[in-house]
Amino acid sequence: MASVSLGIWSAVGSRCERAGETGISHFLEHMLFKGTPLRSAARISQEVEGLGGYINACTSEESTCYHARAHAGHAAKLMDVLADMYLNPVFDRQEITRERRVIKEEIAMTLDQPSQHVLELSDESLWPGQPLGRSIAGDERTLNRTRRRELAGFHARHYVSGS
């Protein structure tokens, strides 16, 4: 059985964040799964997982990747879903509030894992005051300040041709 893996990489990660935007790349990654004008958050998952597929994303210092995998015969559907998510997020305010809580839980889990926490402290020591020295997930202060306007603005600046 042949499978296909597709991905959209954007050359934007935590390193591209301005002061006061810590974690916005990661927050945006979460929000792209939360609906478009054509698809609800549930429909995004259902359209891929209903094919026996898998869809996910990851954010690093240098890039953000949205990827999906399914039977090779579903390549066009995977690309349609990924492209719609990438280009047309709606940034629903209720979903933003929910995802803010999810990300805070992720941050707390990282702090509870000594090996992960040590890596973040090392980056902070190696790159003080620099984007590379800040947590990819952000911190509670910046998460609480991040609103729809900031997410949409970051998307408009970085999720365009050439980024």
Feature locations, PLM:
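Charge-rich, well-structured scaffold segments of protease-associated domains
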Residues: 41-163
